[in-house]
Amino acid sequence: MAERERALTPPYGGVFVPRARVMDPDDVRRATWRMAHEILERNHGTDGLVLIGLQTGGVPITGRLAEAIDSVSGVMVPTGTLDVAFYRDDIGLRPVLPEAATQIPVDLTAKTVVLIDDVLFTGRTVRAALNALSDFGRARAIQLAVMIDRGHRELPIRPDYVGKNLPTRREEMVDVGEEGVWIGTLEDK
């Protein structure tokens, strides 16, 4: 495999082959800080704020956003992780994956939840997350933050906070990692 190529887990399978880097690590850092400021401004601080990262891509972004919010506000907001595999509407069409840990440290009742993912594509993962969150209390508000919004929505879902809008073709893939954001294709193993 080339330096950036990596094997992908189901449902995609195959190998991600990068075509171009669209955000370097500094771009991702700046986007994270901007989103942190936007979250604080929109919510008038950190009171009642909870950050929930979607397994697996949203989890590292959640940690970085929490650190940025702490640096700006001096408050470390509660964070958690959410696995939506069994809430998806396409569960029968995809291979069943091992369940990733859902860890939500607080009752979400009357809280403002910022749901965080790496890439927003069709909106189906977010729809599943909204269903899953209801098991943890009735949030006052749920907001959505994504590092990349690539369009191609199949459901009426729109993010509140976006690191970068990145128009893509449907067959392209986007990979968000520590080295930045890459656009590429999926090839058989």
Feature roles, as predicted:
Residues 1-189:
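PRPP-associated nucleotide enzymes
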